[in-house]
Amino acid sequence: MTTTGYIGTYTKKEGKGVYRFQLDEETGKITEVKTGYELEASTYVNQHNHFLYAVTKEGDDCGIASLKIESDGTLSLINKCLASTAGNGCYVSASPDGKYIFEAIYGAGLARIYEANPETGEIVRLIQELAHDYPTGPSERQEQPHVHYLNTTPDEKYVVAMDLGTDKVITYEYGDDGLKVYDTIEFEPGDGPRHITFHENGKHAYVVHELSNIVSTLKYENGHFTEIERHLTIPENFDGDTKLAAVRISHDQNFLYISNRGHDSLAIFKVGDEGATISLVDIVKSGGEFPRDFNITESDDYLVCAHQEGDYALTVFKRDKVTGNIEIVDNQETAPEGVCVQFLR
């Protein structure tokens, strides 16, 4: 079986935009990596139905590109909505019904919501650009709000934002009029919450904190979060420069994976108590430099990790579904400045 994947990249050095790759799940080898669509600053991509949405910019104009996924996995442009000059995005997602697109803007501390046509994939308009205005954290990286993630909750009723600059998670109501704050939760000063992933039961979530290298387990209910426990994602005796990046849960919901940039590793946690608790299994080297993102195949057999720096390795790990452990089976292909990994669903 061959699985198609997409890599979002920076385009500051050698990156060309969105890359498309093929993974042979019989051998665990990546058989090809090609430029899927040349797009400036396409650092995050996300799929909804037959459409792939990507953050992008042209000069000072910033926003979202909509790409059609053809039957063979190739990409063609539907349209772009470059409606702001306030900063380019770092995360993009779509509402489950495809009517809204959400974009997180790290540098300017903004949350954007767009109207989209769920039938054609066209981005119709920018509805709102909302600036976060909360007290910031104590770290020098927290000089202002920094929105790093914006996506819907499992109940589809809210949008949740991670703000690295203010140590807060904010939930919003959303609709044709834009975003309206519903609730906030504040973490420890200097945590720097970056990304979140949910257990499929919709009752628990896992937030990774970029600055403290901590993962928090949370209880979720109707737009409200409560922190349950905290775990370090790097060895306690490591004193080098490192910052946490991505978090993914295996499709069987049994294991949580987290990437550490600097330590250049993947932390593996066993999920217990129906998602309420996690326990460290191992911390494994990622196979390259600066592993900003990775993803797990639908089969749960493989994990593919992109590396932003060094030789830009695209590393394939074979997963043990029982223990959660991973082992490198392919480290030959590259994706320049790769920072986002998504598999075609």
Curated annotation (Swiss-Prot):
Pfam families: Lactonase
Source species taxonomy: Bacteria, Bacillati, Bacillota, Bacilli, Bacillales
GO molecular function annotations of the record: 6-phosphogluconolactonase activity
Protein name: Uncharacterized protein SSP0869
Family that this chain belongs to: Belongs to the cycloisomerase 2 family.
GO cellular component: cytosol
InterPro entries according to UniProt: Cycloisomerase_2, Haem_d1_sf, Lactonase_7-beta_prop, WD40/YVTN_repeat-like_dom_sf
Superkingdom, natural source: Bacteria
